[in-house]
Structure formats: structure tokens, C-alpha cells
Amino acid sequence: MEVENEAHCCPGSSSGGSREYKVVMLGAGGVGKSAVTMQFISHQFPDYHDPTIEDAYKTQVRIDNEPAYLDILDTAGQAEFTAMREQYMRGGEGFIICYSVTDRQSFQEAAKFKELIFQVRHTYEIPLVLVGNKIDLEQFRQVSTEEGMNLARDYNCAFFETSAALRFGIDDAFQGLVREIRRKESMLSLVERKLKRKDSLWKKIKASLKKKRENML
């Protein structure tokens, strides 16, 4: 198994030099964001959770044989823009937008949460994963798998269907987000290295031209 929890509750700073990933859970109230988070960090399904409460969780995991320290913010279900929400939107490195497959309105509201990210970050190039939760309640399904896949394609992000009750697909969702964060960081690093090489080449050309001018004098 590629995702392995090493600790359910970690100290305030990452241990062993692990890379810290700040993850923000978004989605309408009642879609199971907290249950998904709790299953990931502690393999437990909560009996009750107040959807108006925002909470933070930390855990140490290994993903693709690399340590990862996840700092997960589980947000309330409101899609309104607030000063506090702006603060954690700015700090988040990756986002999981969650909806319930048994609630079409929560699926439609996914667009609102994606727009909230854009309002703060002014770009759509932010690591993102779309999650359709509660697939164990298949008899009450209102949103098809195909609809979820199509929306994720529009968002240019990975898509996972999960069941917090059965702990199905939970690790895959967080794993996918961390991989996307790493991928984008790797791309950015590659661009920066290319720019540095171009800058270095440009300086060499200018130095060569300067030397030629000096020799002509």
C-alpha cells in the first residue's frame, strides 16, 4: 500500500525533515469532508460532527516511498467569502473539493468553491482533487460517476469516488493531491532552472561582447 499512516497526531512541526503539505478540504455541509479526513488520519468513522465547525488535523504518511507531513484544514460548508477563509485559501498548497453523490446540489456547488480559490489565488493552476463521497449509498445516488469525471476534466484535476463509511478510496484522494502538488513543484523547479541557464548564457554573451569591444580599443 503506497499510503501508510505513521502517526495519527503529529507535533506542530514536521519530524525527520518531512515535507509539509497544507491541504484544505472544501465542499458543502453534510457531504462528509470531516468523515473523509478522520478516516484518512485515524481510520475511524465519526458518529457525529457539527458541519459548522472548522478544524485542523495533522498526520505523517509515506507516499511513493517519500515521507509527507499533511496539515489538513477541514472547513465549514458555507461557500461565502470571509477574511478567515481568505487566509487559509492563501496558505493552502492543495485543495480537495468534496461533494456527495447522493446530493446533486452539493455537486453543483463545487463550482462555487473552485471560484473561491480563484478569487484569492488569481489562477486556476492550483493543485486540486475532486471527490465524490458516499458511494456506499448507491441506492440514493443522484450524481453519476461519469458526471464527476466530466467535471474533473473541466477542472483539469484528478477525480476520486469515496466512501468514508467503508473507508474506500480515501487514501487515493489524498495521495493523488500530494502527487499533484509534487508534480507542479517539479514543473516550477524545471522552469526556474531553465531561466537560470538562459540568464547565465545571456551574461556570458554580454561578457564576450564586452571583451571584444575592449580588444578593439
From Swiss-Prot:
This is GTP-binding protein Rit2. Changing Q78L: Constitutively active. Dramatic reduction of the rate of GTP hydrolysis. It comes from Mus musculus. GO terms for cellular component: cell body; cytoplasm; cytosol; dendritic tree; Golgi apparatus; membrane raft; nucleoplasm; nucleus. GO terms for biological process: adenylate cyclase-activating G protein-coupled receptor signaling pathway; maintenance of protein location in cell; negative regulation of neuron projection development; positive regulation of MAPK cascade; positive regulation of neuron projection development; positive regulation of transcription by RNA polymerase II; Ras protein signal transduction; regulation of calcium-mediated signaling. Keywords: Calmodulin-binding, Cell membrane, GTP-binding, Hydrolase, Membrane, Nucleotide-binding, Nucleus. Gene3D superfamilies: P-loop containing nucleotide triphosphate hydrolases. It is found in: Nucleus; Cell membrane. Its main location: nucleus. Alternates between an inactive form bound to GDP and an active form bound to GTP. Changing S34N: Dominant negative. Loss of interaction with AFDN, RLF and RALGDS.
